[in-house]
Amino acid sequence: MSVEKAKAYWQLMRMDRPIGTLLLLWPTLWALIIAAEGTPDWHVLLVFVLGVVLMRSAGCVINDFADRKVDGHVKRTQQRPLPSGRVTAKEAVILFLLLGISSFLLVLTMNPLTIQLSFAGIVLAFIYPFMKRYTHLPQLFLGLAFSWAIPMAWAAQANELPWVVWFVFAINALWTIAYDTQYAMVDRDDDIQIGVKSTAILFGRHDKLIIGLLQLLTLVMLVWLGLHYQLGQSFYWSVLAAGALFVYQQHLIRHRQRELCFQAFLNNNYVGMVLALGLFVAFW
């Protein structure tokens, strides 16, 4: 394999842009910390950190495969490996399968409940990229896909799925819809021209308001989570910090400028991080 081909595969997996991996990792860590009520099992932690990297990479590959015929018409994505011809569709499918199989082999070291849940995770990762052709709610499907690691991680750590798992699942799904709508605002004009659907298009001039409402609901549910577990001040400080970051994001997107909407999207990494730190300290 040539250096150029390896570089193309690396870019296809978005290894040069880790934001998606981080946004998937933080809620996974939330689940592990809460399920363990502190420090999770090291084997489980290692499996899920590696699994997040592999599955996010697999998701990027299948996403670019699904979008290979439209990415060439979008300024931001024209130079991706598939539309630029540096990777073929067949090579992308093979890479997706290799990443998916590698992830499943990791899951096989977990308990039966986690293994059973993994099948739904694979389905969600596969179907999400195609949803933008059929519905204005692909961000909802991303929310489901990016939240599925939560019940899996919880099951791996505690071997059970109490109802609060799905509450945390809902928190993350709402947050994901909010930040992926910010991301969709970057490409909205191009998406309208080529017929791709998104919540940014669906929400229209109400986009900032709806993002704000989703963020507010996320914060309210986080406070309830803290009350349920009787968490200390460190967690509420982290929720307050997340709220401040949401306010900053609203400031960034106020004029709907592409670059600033993208910066708002990237800023969500800090939201996930401060909440993970708050949970860790609270359960310590």
Curated annotation (Swiss-Prot):
Reactions this protein catalyses: all-trans-octaprenyl diphosphate + 4-hydroxybenzoate = 4-hydroxy-3-(all-trans-octaprenyl)benzoate + diphosphate
Membrane topology according to the record: Multi-pass membrane protein
InterPro entries: HB_polyprenyltransferase-like, Prenyltransferase, UbiA_prenyltransferase, UbiA_sf
Keywords: Cell inner membrane, Cell membrane, Magnesium, Membrane, Transferase, Transmembrane, Transmembrane helix, Ubiquinone biosynthesis
Membrane-spanning segments: 18-38, 42-62, 93-113, 136-156, 161-181, 209-229, 233-253, 264-284
Oxidoreductase found in the keyword field: no
Cofactor: Mg(2+)
GO biological process per UniProt: ubiquinone biosynthetic process
Compartmental location: Cell inner membrane
Job description of the protein: Catalyzes the prenylation of para-hydroxybenzoate (PHB) with an all-trans polyprenyl group. Mediates the second step in the final reaction sequence of ubiquinone-8 (UQ-8) biosynthesis, which is the condensation of the polyisoprenoid side chain with PHB, generating the first membrane-bound Q intermediate 3-octaprenyl-4-hydroxybenzoate.
HAMAP family tied to this protein: UbiA (MF_01635)
Protein name, as recorded: 4-hydroxybenzoate octaprenyltransferase
Gene: ubiA
